[in-house]
Amino acid sequence: MAPADGHAAGTGRGLPLLLTAPPADAPSPREVLQHRPLLFFGGKGGVGKTTLAAAVAVGSADAGRRTLLVSTDPAHSVGDVLRIGLGNEPSGVLPNLWALEIDPTEEADRYIAGVKERIAEVTPPRLAAEVERQIDVARVSPGAEEAALFDRFTRLMEEAGTGYERVVFDTAPLGHTLRLLALPEQLQQWIRGLIGRRRQVNVMRRMWRNVAGAAAGEARPDDPVLEALEERRARFARARDALTDPTRAAFVFVVTPERLPILETERATRILERYRIPVGAVVVNRVLPAAAEGPFAERRRDEEAGHLDDIRRRFAAHALLGVPQLPRDVQGLDDLRRLWEVLGRALPR
């Protein structure tokens, strides 16, 4: 990776890629981008988070780290940036890079099928049809796909340190992503309630069997429904612990020097702070290069300067990295490698 000289050779003379040095108590952006096992890229739609997530994943793979790049955005574009077709399961991209685009519909169908299988084991035959109908109704209810997506999301998080050294997430636009990241706290409470009620049901069953004797039938030595709930509670607890561990996870916000992305990103950083999810850096994308000339560029540069000052003020607690507006779209592995080199020049050693 190129030296951290604070300038982007060949992409705009004098561009201050390291917009501010990280505060003393902030994590090193170099360590975050190069080594953090769980890395989440997020931002307002259209700011370039997918491209930057892919560039970091390619750089990680080229450095010899087994890396999984995951898109949780329903409007997938990771495959477009990589110029390969992707599906709901990992596909090989490079010797150390795999990528997938989570399909919420497929995940919801798979999730519901698993629920039906577990419920069928403990449902009396006379109730089976009605129970299955109720499950099918739940499949099309609001939040079903989001819950299934989160279930897959937590499973993929556990791949970091097991199947892969790093998992890089290209997340959906901020509103959707913040709801997803808030789910561990919300679902923990919900599952605790379900487990409590399930245990009460099991107590009543045992009491009934003791009273009814052999006529009540043999008691099951296990309860697949309770086992599934306990497994999910444990997995969601691990997800919450991982998300809030600054040595394991970091969220990288991508913002452009424009008013609306700045405001939305500031609100998002406050929400993550509330949930104790560490912010590793803020990347300011598409900064106008100093080499750009002409009346339009001058007017744009004047307006951008005000936005950059605003960014420095609003995100003073975080490392701020700048990426210049490039002369053409980033497409394919070679372009992503060049972008990773540009970003690398901003990383303090």
Describe the residue ranges of each PLM region:
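Conserved phosphate-coordination/catalytic loops
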Residues: A144-A147, E230-R233, R259, R301-D302
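P-loop (Walker A) phosphate-binding loop of NTP-binding proteins
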Residues: K44
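C-terminal lobe/tail of nucleotide-utilizing enzymes
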Residues: M1-L33, G85, R205, F236-R349
